[in-house]
Each structure stands twice: as C-alpha cells, then as structure tokens.
Amino acid sequence: MSKLEALKFILLLGAVYYAIGGIAHYFGLTIFPFFVSELYVPYQDSIIALVCLIFVLLLLAVARDPIKNVDTLNVLILGVALASVFSILIIYKIDLASLGAPAKKLQTITEGIMGFIYLGLLLWLHPRRKI
C-alpha cells in the first residue's frame, strides 16, 4: 500500500468515526458503556451531529484526491488538532463527577488520545507539495 493509498484509507476511517459519533449524538445512543443520559441534551447533541456531518463530508471529499485537495486537508488537520485539544481541555473545564458522570473522564481522555493518534497519522501521511 502506497503512502497516498494509506492516507485515503485513514481519511475514510475518519469519516466512519465521525459518522458513528454524529449518529450517536443525534439519537442519544451510546458507544461507550458508561453512557449518562443526564448529559444528553438534544439541542447541543444535534449541533455536535451537524459538525460531525460536516467533518464526514470534508473527509470524504479530500479522500478522493488528497493531493489536489491539500489545502482542505490542511484545514482538516487543524480541525482534528483543535478537536483533540478540546477533548483534553473538557476534563479541566467541566466537573463530570458533579454531573453524575465520573466515568466520562476516561471516555474523554480516550477520545483525545485517539484524536492525537489520528492527527499524527494525517501528518505522517501528508502529501508534501514540491515547489
């Protein structure tokens, strides 16, 4: 598998991840075993689902031709970096235990670490432009 094929696969994998996350948020489903229904807020989770849908569309568009769409790939990389940082910052901003969801801390850490691993893969597989 070439580096470009690997990048396309990783982009498609990201689209699947965000599609599953968007569906879970929109319908109030759980992916992790420690779902806390009190944290489900239809309005906010619908906004998260919309953001996931936008990410899915961008990932799929870039996966078709990452070299041609390198500028959009760069925007996606920045978006993944921001999402990963925000996942970690949530731990410090929100007292999940006081909301009755202490196990959400582990979920949030897991999501942040997965995001940073995904970010690393995108950076490693990035098709550098030759000027």
Predicted features and spans:
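Membrane-interface helix-boundary motifs at transmembrane edges
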Residues: 1-4, 63-72, 99-100, 130-131
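Membrane-interfacial loop-to-transmembrane alpha-helix junctions, especially the N-terminal start
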Residues: 7-12, 68-76
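Core segments of alpha-helical transmembrane spans in multipass integral membrane proteins
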Residues: 16-24, 42-63, 78-85
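Non-cytosolic membrane-interface motifs at loop->transmembrane helix junctions
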Residues: 34-43, 98-110
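Membrane-water interface at the C-terminal end of transmembrane alpha helices
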Residues: 112-131
